[in-house]
Amino acid sequence: MEMKVLILVGVRLLFLPTTVCQSGMKHVSDNSALTAESFNGNEHSFEEFPLSDIEGWTGATTTIKAKCPEESITTLHVNNATMGYLRSSLSTKVIPAIYILVFVIGVPANIVTLWKLSSRTKSICLVIFHTNLAIADLLFCVTLPFKIAYHLNGNDWVFGEVMCRVTTVAFYGNMYCAILILTCMGINRYLATVHPFTYRKLPKRNFTLLMCGVVWVMVVLYMLPLAILKQEYHLVQPGITTCHDVHDTCESPLPFQFYYFVSLAFFGFLIPFVVSVFCYTTLIHKLNAQDRKWLRYIKAVLLILVIFTICFAPTNIILIIHHANYYYSNTDSLYFMYLIALCLGSLNSCLDPFLYFIMSKIVDQLTS
């Protein structure tokens, strides 16, 4: 008897009217008003599904990859979390206020630094290092008005694709150029103080020029992907054009983004940071506390550590976590924090000139 009942139920399910299935499909379609996409997605490469159907959804952006279209994408759809950031006072008021401060202080400070360096005859190594550092900072600062206008305009970029790529390259290029030059300065001071006999045998001017040349070549090569890949996208909602805030994963695939940015943070920050800490701490231990230049070296080292800790460390640590989180877990909830950290990273353009004045005092004491 039970067997007959099961057979009848199975036959009934097999010949279930298609109208029931069609009504169910229509119900699902009607509920998919919000699409879960990310800073790294486009409307053609993601399936749409209601955010309310995600169990335990907390606002982190989740994406479902599908086949990428063959044609180039210039218009994207983003979720409510992304639009919330793009419209927030943090993005349209606080971040541009910090950039204005950096521009107002950084431009004159670096111009004065270059003017002072042009008339300096002592310590050619100091002149070469800080000239390169001031040039990198100044190149970055002159692109800040475009970023300021972008954020004050509600994150609506009006300067075109080329200028968007230029400002993006200037942003990252300045940060990693500053990190590497500060590291080279630490190596130079380490050799001069800890290994003076070896240092005296080196062709100081050519050696310093070589170090700075290698830094610029490395930075230019690492910035090529940012200069080549598309950075500007128009958002259907809220009807703005973003610059570097939204990416298309079909234009820049996830594996490439992950390995590129992680290697950038690893070779551009983590290794130089370890080398800098080693060089400067060894330098402090080598010097006698009674030495007249010891206190100034302490000030210089503290300022360098402040620059690394406030300007460079948060950006690169969050950069690694963000891309690892997005690559392995398919979420990008840390992207807001990363953009804030990137904004704080611009403060190094204001602090570098003060480092020059401290280091110049040390050199003047040594040669007096």
UniProtKB/Swiss-Prot annotation:
It is found in: Cell membrane. The chain crosses the membrane at residues 94-114, 124-144, 167-187, 209-229, 258-278, 301-321, 339-359. It comes from the Eukaryota. Keywords: Blood coagulation, Cell membrane, Disulfide bond, G-protein coupled receptor, Glycoprotein, Hemostasis, Membrane, Receptor, Signal, Transducer, Transmembrane, Transmembrane helix. Its main location: membrane. It is a multi-pass membrane protein. Residues 38-93, 145-166, 230-257, 322-338 are extracellular. Residues 115-123, 188-208, 279-300, 360-368 are cytoplasmic. The keyword Glycoprotein applies. PROSITE patterns: G_PROTEIN_RECEP_F1_2. One of its GO terms (molecular function) is receptor ligand activity. Residues 1-21 form the signal peptide. Glycans are attached at N80. One of its GO terms (biological process) is ligand-gated ion channel signaling pathway. Disulfide bonds join C164-C243. A proteolytic cleavage generates a new N-terminus that functions as a tethered ligand. GO terms for cellular component: apical plasma membrane; plasma membrane; protein-containing complex. The record marks E37, S38 as: Cleavage. Residues 22-37 form a propeptide. InterPro entries: GPCR_Rhodpsn, GPCR_Rhodpsn_7TM, Prot_act_rcpt_3, Protea_act_rcpt. Belongs to the G-protein coupled receptor 1 family. Receptor for activated thrombin coupled to G proteins that stimulate phosphoinositide hydrolysis. Interacts with INSC/inscuteable and GPSM2. This is Proteinase-activated receptor 3. It comes from Rattus norvegicus (Rat). The lineage of its organism: Eukaryota, Metazoa, Chordata, Craniata, Vertebrata.
